[in-house]
Amino acid sequence: MEHIADNLKTFIVNSSSEERILYTKEFKWIGYTKAKIILDKMVDLTTYPKGHRMPNLLLVGESNNGKTALLKKFCRSHQSYVDEKTAKLKCPVLMIQSPPEPDEKRFYNAILNSVLAPTKTSEKIENRQNRVIHLLKELEVKVLIIDEIHHVLAGTISKQRLFLNVIKYLSNELNIPLVCSGTKLAFNAIQTDSQLSNRFEPNILVRWENNTDYKRLLASFEKVLPIKKRSNLIEDKLSNKILLMSDGLIGEISKILELSTILAINTTSEKITLDILNEIDYIAPQNRKKAFFNNGIY
């Protein structure tokens, strides 16, 4: 089992099929070059000196192409802690999800809920804003992450402008970098405010292509799949098939390998083959709408 990471070999030998299947379903972070570059940039933001104009980062990618997983990886590396000298809670990185539509009150509530602070329905919006600013300063938040920022576009033009002004005001008051993330619509959302757009550096997670980085990604995946035989995922027929099925989205690649690993365990073949890939219960992203039409749903 030379294809398996050393810390996984003992687990595979001593575990039942059910235990290995359960392990397969657990999320595993698979690093890759572009993710490392973006993570390094975000780490740099946590130590950036406070100044007149703080740098911001905009993470753009298609749905299921690794944006949220990357952000959560960053958050896990910068968890809240209690300062031993002051006995106060510190939260260097705070991540929230943008509300489904641009709404100032719901935005503040998302922040308050994330730090387990109470929310009051009757509280005036300016008081809520002041409380958010006070709490984030007390927690010494270094970077604020707003995921699904493209939700801004779900509102009217006036609501979009108001919401973006709220974000801009919060950033100015706290004097900290922002990281916003979303689909390609996120870029359009930020571009509606010229001042904000100039502050954000866009970083794009593109679809995977059949190149060295993609083969390296598959090799990394194979090291954490709890099956006993080498599948050699980087072999052309397998790698091409996985890329075609996944439509180049890392979330889909992960799901395909999860389903294939489970089938390989259940059939005792203990390796991923073309037959296994053809047998898994999976519909490629580009074929899902077609499947609805074919089944008379539309």
What do these predicted ranges mean?
Residues 153-155, 165-233, 237:
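The catalytic "switch" region of P-loop NTPases
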Residues 39-51:
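Pre-Walker A adenine-sensing motif
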Residues 93-94, 99-120:
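Conserved NTP-binding/hydrolysis module of P-loop NTPases
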Residues 135-158:
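Conserved P-loop NTPase "ATPase switch" module shared by AAA+ and STAND
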Residues 51-73:
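Walker A/P-loop nucleotide-binding motif
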Residues 20-38:
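Dynamic helix-loop-helix/coil hinge segments at AAA+ ATPase domain boundaries and subdomain interfaces
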Residues 1-17, 64, 211-212, 219-298:
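C-terminal alpha-helical "lid" subdomain
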Residues 76-87, 117:
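Post-Walker A helix-loop "phosphate-sensing" segment adjacent to the P-loop in P-loop NTPases
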